[in-house]
């Protein structure tokens, strides 16, 4: 009897919703919408598409429907653009119109409904947060202030690998050590602190919470409840876990880092030995002036833990994997550094501009294995036109940035890992968005400001490793597995492979 009642209730809801949608369409504004599959009432195209909206699946739809298409996912409009011309329109020409961020039930939890910078809507709060975060994080002065620390952390990785006897025989999962390096690089900038080892209890706790946050946020498991509000009650358990993880992370940031820095400030100078403040000092200054509140401070820390640490780590891991699988390219990188810098001279940040082949390897890694292949989703607040089509207000706009430089119509043999392309036919292309066929960091007002940190960190880390060790697949294998794992808008390697690292002798 209960089952029969449930079936009748669901059927009644379905019929009522169908009627409501039909009436709304008859009475509402008539749009010329982008092409796409025909949706069914309530569910839209969700039943056919499913939850996994990764960059490769969306590329397949672009091949069917064109450079702009619309997926009606439940009650959400999802517009995907897949050409350089339309990417320019969204990110540059109409950057104000498309400059907001879409809401999401899970990201609302992790960002306090947009109290951060990355996921807030376009407006005064975003401008304020961007300004407050730029000085302590995203300027050349920051690069010059902290580059010695980055070089020291990379040197520490090299020494640990060289001193690990197993590394040169059976191999090690080098990603674990690189993860510690990335945390130390960013926590030096944020708090003038570092973790001594992978076993540091605070590091273990922090890494676990950040990992759980990433898993929950990047999963496609919750899409159905985000797309179809009447199904949201089924997400109750998932959202409860998200809130618990969010609360534990923010409490950890507050207790162990922000409050500790405040205590130091009350007892002694918080400037470093060279008289320069770390990032949290600048942010707390803004808080004292009343520009931001306590929660904003914590959500800034939240953004850096995710946006800066994870994405750069993924790119380093991808770069190493490609060099392991392309020994000829690895040898060319090594030969260039030996020739230009001299054998044994460890690469530094000022050296990077002298090493065009190393730079080309980094660009090629970001092209083929883009860490954020769909960029961070955009949203329009009104009803603009795009390529002659009407885009309904509050649509989720995805730029398939991965497809732009992997489309054979625009790039020569894009499926190949070939750094030479950036020294030959694509020598003018940079990672800063000067060519709309290649946007690893986006472009325009909502582009990733972390480019100024990511590129030198990638160059120093990959350069130091290649200089000092031969990176090889494990015994019995000719290559390592580079299968992808895509998330809501992330792309990282599926399996953290074991890599043999044989020390070089100079």
Curated annotation (Swiss-Prot):
The chain crosses the membrane at residues 3-23. It comes from the Eukaryota. PROSITE patterns: CYTOCHROME_P450 (PS00086). Keywords: Heme, Iron, Membrane, Metal-binding, Monooxygenase, Oxidoreductase, Transmembrane, Transmembrane helix. It is a single-pass membrane protein. GO terms for cellular component: membrane. (E)-cinnamate binds at residues 213-218, 307. Its main location: membrane. Its EC number is 1.14.14.91. It is found in: Membrane. GO terms for molecular function: heme binding; iron ion binding; trans-cinnamate 4-monooxygenase activity. InterPro entries: Cyt_P450, Cyt_P450_CS, Cyt_P450_E_grp-I, Cyt_P450_sf. Its cofactor is heme. Heme binds at residue 448. Pfam families: p450 (PF00067). GO terms for biological process: lignin metabolic process. Pathway: Phenylpropanoid metabolism; trans-4-coumarate biosynthesis; trans-4-coumarate from trans-cinnamate: step 1/1. It catalyses: (E)-cinnamate + reduced [NADPH--hemoprotein reductase] + O2 = (E)-4-coumarate + oxidized [NADPH--hemoprotein reductase] + H2O + H(+). It is an enzyme of class 1 (oxidoreductase). Induction: By fungal elicitor. Catalyzes the first oxidative step of the phenylpropanoid pathway in higher plants by transforming trans-cinnamate into p-coumarate. The compounds formed by this pathway are essential components for lignification, pollination, and defense against ultraviolet light, predators and pathogens. Belongs to the cytochrome P450 family. This is Trans-cinnamate 4-monooxygenase. The gene is CYP73A3.
């Amino acid at each position: 009897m209960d089952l029969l009642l449930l079936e009748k209730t669901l059927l009644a809801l379905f019929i009522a919703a169908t009627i409501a949608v039909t009436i709304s369409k008859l009475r509402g504004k008539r749009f010329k919408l982008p092409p796409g599959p025909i949706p069914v009432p309530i569910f839209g195209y969700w039943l056919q598409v499913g939850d996994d909206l990764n960059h490769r699946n969306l590329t397949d739809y672009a091949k069917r429907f064109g450079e702009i298409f619309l997926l009606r996912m439940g009650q959400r409009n999802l517009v995907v653009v897949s050409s350089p011309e339309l990417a320019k329109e969204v990110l540059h020409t109409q950057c104000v119109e498309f400059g907001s961020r879409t809401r999401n039930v899970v990201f609302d939890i992790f960002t306090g409904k947009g109290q951060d910078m990355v996921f807030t809507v376009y407006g005064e709060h975003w401008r304020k947060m961007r300004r407050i975060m730029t000085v302590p994080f995203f300027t050349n002065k920051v690069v010059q202030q902290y580059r010695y620390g980055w070089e020291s952390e990379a040197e520490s990785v090299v020494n640990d690998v060289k001193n690990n006897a197993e590394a040169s025989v059976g191999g090690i999962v080098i990603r674990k050590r690189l993860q510690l390096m990335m945390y130390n690089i960013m926590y030096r900038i944020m708090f003038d602190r570092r973790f001594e080892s992978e076993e540091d209890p605070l590091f273990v706790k922090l890494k676990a919470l950040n990992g759980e946050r990433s898993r929950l946020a990047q999963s496609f498991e919750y899409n159905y409840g985000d797309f179809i509000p009447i199904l949201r009650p089924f997400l109750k358990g998932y959202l409860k876990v998200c809130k618990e993880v969010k609360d534990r992370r923010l409490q950890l940031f507050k207790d162990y880092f922000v409050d500790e820095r405040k205590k130091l400030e009350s007892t002694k100078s918080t400037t470093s030995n060279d008289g320069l403040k770390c990032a949290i000092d600048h942010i707390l200054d803004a808080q004292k002036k009343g520009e931001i509140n306590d929660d904003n401070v914590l959500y800034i820390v939240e953004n850096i833990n995710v946006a800066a640490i994870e994405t750069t780590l993924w790119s380093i891991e991808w770069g190493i994997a490609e060099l392991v699988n392309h020994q000829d390219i690895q040898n060319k990188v090594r030969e260039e550094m030996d020739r230009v810098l001299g054998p044994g001279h460890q690469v530094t940040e000022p050296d990077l501009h002298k090493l065009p082949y190393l730079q080309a390897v980094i660009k090629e890694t970001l092209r083929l294995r883009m860490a954020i292949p769909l960029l961070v989703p955009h949203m329009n607040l009104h009803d603009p036109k795009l390529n002659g089509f009407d885009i309904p207000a509050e649509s989720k706009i995805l730029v398939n940035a991965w497809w732009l430089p992997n489309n054979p119509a625009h790039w020569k043999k894009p499926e190949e890992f070939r750094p030479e392309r950036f020294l030959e036919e694509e020598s003018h292309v940079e990672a800063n968005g000067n060519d709309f066929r290649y946007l690893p960091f986006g472009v325009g007002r909502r582009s990733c400001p972390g480019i100024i940190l990511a590129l030198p960190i990638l160059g120093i880390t990959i350069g130091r490793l290649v200089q000092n060790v031969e990176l090889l697949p494990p015994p019995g294998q000719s290559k390592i597995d580079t299968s992808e794992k895509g998330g809501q808008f992330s792309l990282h390697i599926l399996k953290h492979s074991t890599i043999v690292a044989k020390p070089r002798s100079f």
